[in-house]
UniProtKB/Swiss-Prot annotation:
GO molecular function: glycerol-3-phosphate dehydrogenase [NAD(P)+] activity; NAD binding
Function of the protein: Catalyzes the reduction of the glycolytic intermediate dihydroxyacetone phosphate (DHAP) to sn-glycerol 3-phosphate (G3P), the key precursor for phospholipid synthesis.
SUPFAM superfamilies registered for this protein in UniProt: 6-phosphogluconate dehydrogenase C-terminal domain-like (SSF48179), NAD(P)-binding Rossmann-fold domains (SSF51735)
Gene Ontology terms describing biological process: carbohydrate metabolic process; glycerol-3-phosphate biosynthetic process; glycerol-3-phosphate catabolic process; glycerophospholipid metabolic process; phospholipid biosynthetic process
Chain positions recorded as NADPH binding sites: 13, 33, 108, 142, 257, 281, 283
UniProt keywords, alphabetically: Cytoplasm, Lipid biosynthesis, Lipid metabolism, NAD, NADP, Nucleotide-binding, Oxidoreductase, Phospholipid biosynthesis, Phospholipid metabolism
Name by which UniProt lists this protein: Glycerol-3-phosphate dehydrogenase [NAD(P)+]
Binding site for sn-glycerol 3-phosphate: 108, 138, 193, 246, 256-258
Family named by the database record: Belongs to the NAD-dependent glycerol-3-phosphate dehydrogenase family.
Main localization (coarse): cytoplasm
Length: 333
């Protein structure tokens, strides 16, 4: 039997995932602040602002701008808000979400200022126990999923039964979720790969080829794995869908906002210029400095994140970024 599921945030990924949930037989309510988006989904089953490629969203999707109305009957509440605004937005929902509901994060990022993962931000904001929090991450480019292309993802929760409940709620003929208890690993994969995607995109935009891209991706994977393990993650997570899988998709597609943002930097645009032409939030931009700070906190070197931080804050070129990745001494891989 289908569940009542609320999605907080009607951006491209939130809306695409709402469609997955509706296709899986659930009753889906989208919450958004923008009245135009609410009316579009509720009255016309169309999100012309954030996901115009889908001409008609399923009939079992609706929308509201009222927080209490959005979550009052929810069995599952999915959070799809820009990572750096999650804490402020979620505080408004504290006390409104039913005590039995599982809260699921689609967000990927490290909070600036606190260096906290999204599982920590969500649980603190809502005063939520660990067994009622789940995260979803994987190679999930929103437009392809909106077009119902075959895809897979990973659902993480410390309570495997609750992870399975969430996975069952989003299983369709084209969308296959797997489950894990490694919340930390999943969160770290989803956040840190965005920094790597910025760097790969920048290299591509600057005209570099496959060798350079492969170098950045593999060294980025090593960096994010080391950070994750230091934070308590299972290293195997980084070599599955949430790690390597997401890295491949995010670092190889113009549909990735982080890749595209980096490519624009590589072509010579400033951070301000690249931001203006971006369609949506490139989470890797605010996450980069947080990753460097997290590396300092965990005593893990983060040369790629550090060099991308210099790109974003000092305006160094792609060639300077790449030159700074490695020291002069020969080391083991």
């Amino acid at each position: 039997m289908g569940k009542n599921i609320t999605v907080l945030g009607a951006g491209a990924w939130g809306t695409a995932f709402g469609q997955v949930l509706a296709d899986a037989g659930n009753t889906v309510t989208m919450w958004a602040k923008e009245q135009q988006i609410v009316e579009g989904i509720r009255d016309h089953h169309h999100n012309a602002v954030r996901l115009p490629s889908v001409e008609k969203l399923p009939d079992n999707m609706t929308a509201t701008g009222d927080r209490a109305e959005a979550v009052k009957n929810a069995d599952i509440v999915v959070v799809a808000i820009a990572a750096q605004f999650a804490r402020v937005a979620l505080v408004e929902f504290k006390g409104l979400i039913p005590d039995h509901a599982i809260v699921v994060s689609l967000m990927k990022g490290i909070e600036r200022g606190t260096n906290k993962r999204m599982d920590e931000v969500v649980r603190e904001s809502l005063d939520l126990p660990a067994d009622r929090f789940a995260a979803i991450s994987g190679p999930n480019l929103s437009k392809e999923i909106a077009d119902r292309h075959p895809a897979a993802t990973v659902v993480a929760c410390t309570n495997l039964d609750n992870a399975t409940k969430v996975a069952e709620a989003c299983t369709t003929s084209y969308f296959k979720p797997f489950v894990t208890t490694d919340v930390i690993g999943l969160e770290m994969c989803g956040s840190l790969k965005n920094v790597t995607a910025l760097a790969v995109g920048m290299a591509r935009g600057a005209g570099y080829g496959e060798n350079t891209a492969a170098m950045i991706e593999t060294r980025g994977l090593a960096e994010l794995t080391a950070l994750g393990v230091a934070a308590g993650a299972d290293p195997k997570t980084f070599f599955g869908l949430a790690g390597v899988g997401d890295l491949i998709a995010t670092c190889g597609s113009s549909l990735s906002r982080n890749y595209t943002f980096g490519a624009n930097l590589g072509k010579g645009l400033t951070v301000e210029e690249a931001t203006k032409v971006s369609n949506g939030v490139a989470e890797g931009v605010p996450t980069t400095d947080a990753v460097v700070a997290l590396g300092d906190q965990l005593d893990v070197p983060t040369p790629l994140a550090y060099q991308m931080s210099r790109v974003l804050n000092e305006g160094i070129s792609c060639s300077e970024m790449l030159a700074g990745l490695f020291g002069h001494e020969v080391t083991g891989e």
